Amino acid sequence: MQKRELYEIADGKLVRKHRFCPRCGPGVFLAEHADRFTCGRCGYTEFKKVKKAKS
């Protein structure tokens, strides 16, 4: 994925599509997987919360 694909312009402002890594800081994005967010540089991982269906 290229850096330009991680941003979009909305109402004349630059908006990030992905989150930055809290360990590495600005400029290092977290990759979005089906069940987690992962940093490719330091290995930081955040798991997504699973919504349980009411029965």
Curated annotation (Swiss-Prot):
Which key words tag this protein in UniProt? Metal-binding, Ribonucleoprotein, Ribosomal protein, Zinc, Zinc-finger
What family classification does the UniProt entry report for this protein? Belongs to the eukaryotic ribosomal protein eS31 family.
One GO MF term = zinc ion binding
User: What InterPro entries has UniProt attached to this entry?
Assistant: Ribosomal_eS31, Ribosomal_eS31_arc, Ribosomal_zn-bd
> In the UniProt record, what gene is named as encoding this protein?
rps27ae
Record's Gene Ontology CC terms?
ribonucleoprotein complex; ribosome
Residue ranges covered by zinc fingers (C4-type)? 21-42
Q: Which residues bind Zn(2+)?
A: 21, 24, 39, 42
* Gene3D superfamilies from the UniProt entry: 6.20.50.180
Q: Cross-referenced Pfam families, in alphabetical order?
A: Ribosomal_S27
Query: What is the free-text note on the cofactor?
Result: Binds 1 zinc ion per subunit.
What name goes with this protein? Small ribosomal subunit protein eS31
**Subunit structure as annotated in this protein's UniProt entry:** Part of the 30S ribosomal subunit.
What are the BP-aspect GO terms? translation
Cofactors demanded by this protein = Zn(2+)
